[in-house]
Amino acid sequence: MDFITNRKFRSTLLCHQNIPINRKIEFENLKDFYTTFNIRPISSENKIDLNNEQENISFYYENLPEPFISTTSAIMKAILYVYAENISNPIRLEQVAKEAFKKLGKYQLQDFLAILEQHFITFIFQGYLKIFETKPHAIATITEKPKTSQFVRYQAKHAHFNNVTNMLSVTNRLNDMIGIPIHEKYILEMLDGTHNIDDIKKGMIEKINSKLLIACDNKGQAVTDPKLLKEFVDYIVNISLEKFRINYLLIG
């Protein structure tokens, strides 16, 4: 059991019988782990002055409707923007500090490490900051011909929908179950690395034209106008690929 996040481990830890397990949570030991923090800034970085410590900047955590964390600290803001830029791309704490240091161009690298040491062990124990001993085998970009694993494509094709949620589940590269609606099922089935994004969009329009999918507007009316249908599919495919990216489902 992972008592930090209060859930069962989905991986196995093998230990030599004659070697004691180090259970101390120390910053020096954590520096070798990869970390990710799923936050989004209210304001993009190019619209603020990181060095202005009179300006309070807030960040959302995952899909929470209200801001999760706010700060006026220039160092903390730089660190949080680094994490926001690297959702689904876990990086070591020292690399976080180096990237944040580049954003400000002043202070010392040790100042950034000190802030990380002061705050981020707490975030780990609260379950907000995720840590990995090895970097997940997923990519953090959407390529010209996106690809997911053969296992995920198999799950998308054969899994049964939950009648209550109208969702099915696929397994990401962290062995977590990710819920997907029916339109994402059809997108995942095409992510074998041979179809570019335009191919995927054409495939989705074919699904709609064949009545496998129904495109509806916000009033629940079917979308039939070709121009509106193209805009609808463009949006659905793009937002779905972004969801797959941040949930460790893409491998190529």
Curated annotation (Swiss-Prot):
Top-rank lineage group of the source organism: Bacteria
InterPro entries membership: PKMT_C
Recorded GO MF terms: lysine N-methyltransferase activity
Name of the protein in its database record: Uncharacterized protein RP027
